[in-house]
From Swiss-Prot:
Entry keyword annotation includes Transferase: yes
This protein's name: tRNA U34 carboxymethyltransferase
tRNA processing among keywords: yes
HAMAP family xrefs: tRNA_carboxymethyltr_CmoB (MF_01590)
Amino acid sequence: MDLSKFNEQQKQILNRIENLANFDCEFSLSDSVNVKFKNLDQAKKDEIYNLALSLKPWRKGPFLLDDIYIDSEWQSFIKFNILAPHLNLAGKCVADVGCNNGYYMFKMLSYDPKSITGFDPSVHTYLQFKFLNKFIRSNINYQLLGVESLPEYAAKFDTIFCLGVIYHRSDPIKMLKELKTALNTGGELFLDTMYIDMDGDFALSPKDRYSKIPNIYFVPTLSALQNWCERAKFKDFTLLETKATDLNEQRKTQWIDGESLSNFLDPADNTKTIEGYPAPKRAYVRVKI
């Protein structure tokens, strides 16, 4: 592990995680990722709770650690439940690019894949994963790497998930090509992106921010998204579902700092962002090579 990527506070949190006791606990899945502890005294429960608080903000989830409910900003099971009917992961090598704290990877464990590897350069979300996996004890491999590292990464994958990443990239076609290099022959990519619900082969390129987010480069129409995928030499573009992002799926909770969706929309017209652009809608697609 390259500790040069960690600041001093993050090193301290990592040390606290690694020094946690090896608890007797059971892992289960529902809409939340659940850990049930056996014989957990109040002092240990307080230690777990305080460590979870130190790892705010929690964007993906939720997680239930005994009776500690980490109510994340995103109700991530909504997205996972959209993808679930289309998943066939048994015996496959799976990657989640932009894996955040591992919520989706933990959910994938029930599909009996051969392996799961997560890629995300965020030390913060890596620490959240390390904290959770201290109790879950999965064999998930978390790499502090971004999508640009995939062409040189040693392993290849049968299925790759890349959810909520492409609009953060200044060259989306290059990103798709990088994802393609990491797939085995016959592999598939599940992609989720914000999109513009209009006809035409174009993408919105926000002047400064979109929904108060500074690093949004291109929000495509569905037709433009398909064109990107085909230019990257993917085939069998399949639109699985579209969905408007609403206040049930993304909202402020005590487990995040700052604002959430209600602050990002025009208070007089929730079909628009605060900047006047169309409000976020998401498209879920699958492509193959």
